[in-house]
């Protein structure tokens, strides 16, 4: 990984703050997308430290973690293999599991062999995808979601906690980007963006149960990520084709959503995870490949300014 120390923060978007509702994000046809999912992902270790994963434009894979809960970060370390898009989640026993698709769409995963411990080798899953997301269901089993190059949507889950996987099942609809998160009551919620930038979501009607149909959000995005606030409200994050950054949240846990609010700055990739104390942290990559993050300064609260990481990841 080329290491570049960046000291400037992203340019502020004039007149837009954390609490201001703005017009729904629109597509500006400014930047061509890669056709693959996010180049950046985050998950939380058993000991509460966040871990960040990313791939660069050469498909090399890197990760780094907080040195202490909510604290400073380690340096980047390389992982073997080559991936184009990535996702990560924590198993019920605290072991992180890391997923990715390579440039041919083949799907791989590896996992910590003990909580906060060493990593297994790569194992291939059948099928081909271009975008991938993962969440943990109410039973503690990971569920994997993805879209392929034709926009077809699939999912599969662990048969037992930390165990082998079911076969793929197809979900109706067509998406190019996917994100998933678990509601406070254990119901999974799936978010996605289609090739026109339209934004959709659907959710389990009961924990571990059947799914609703697709519901469309206003606005247009090219990337999407999700995390859960300390008070149980899901929050989604995304960027549009002009690299503007937006977010919105459930008004109350499991209820309808706020309007979109715009963050300052410009990103082309996003990922989000919740710190051990309940504060969401947002990670992103801009059009030059530079990596940034910001975090809630208190649970359910306002956001810090952007801070830069060293290194370059795929825009």
Q: What annotation goes with each model-predicted range?
A:
Residues 24-315:
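A structural motif
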Residues 1-23:
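Secretory targeting and sorting signals
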């Amino acid at each position: 990984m080329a290491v570049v120390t960046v000291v400037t923060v992203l340019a502020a978007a004039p007149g837009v703050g954390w609490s201001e509702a703005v017009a729904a994000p629109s597509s500006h046809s400014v930047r061509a997308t890669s056709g693959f999912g996010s180049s950046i992902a985050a998950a939380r270790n058993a000991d509460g430290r966040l871990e960040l994963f990313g791939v660069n434009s050469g498909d090399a894979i890197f990760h780094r973690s907080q040195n202490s809960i909510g604290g400073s970060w380690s340096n980047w370390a390389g992982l073997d293999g080559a991936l184009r898009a990535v996702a990560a989640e924590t198993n019920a026993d605290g072991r992180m599991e890391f997923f990715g698709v390579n440039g041919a769409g083949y799907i791989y995963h590896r996992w910590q062999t003990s909580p906060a411990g060493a990593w297994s080798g790569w194992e291939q899953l059948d099928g081909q995808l271009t975008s991938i997301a993962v969440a943990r269901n109410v039973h503690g089993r990971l569920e994997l979601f993805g879209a392929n190059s034709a926009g077809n949507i699939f999912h599969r889950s662990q048969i037992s906690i930390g165990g082998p996987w079911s076969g793929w099942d197809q979900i109706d609809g067509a998406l190019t980007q996917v994100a998933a998160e678990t509601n406070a009551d254990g119901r999974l919620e799936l978010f996605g963006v289609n090739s026109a930038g339209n934004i959709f979501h659907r959710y389990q009607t009961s924990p571990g149960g059947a799914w609703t149909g697709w519901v469309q959000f206003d606005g247009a995005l090219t990337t999407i990520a999700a995390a859960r606030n300390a008070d149980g409200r899901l929050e989604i994050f995304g960027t549009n084709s002009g690299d503007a950054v937006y977010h919105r949240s459930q008004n109350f846990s499991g209820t309808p959503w706020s309007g979109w609010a715009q963050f300052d700055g410009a990103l082309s990739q996003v990922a989000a995870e919740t710190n051990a104390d309940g504060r969401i942290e947002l990670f992103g990559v801009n059009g030059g490949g530079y990596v940034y993050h910001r975090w809630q300064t208190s649970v359910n609260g306002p956001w810090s300014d952007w801070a830069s990481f060293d290194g370059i990841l795929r825009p």
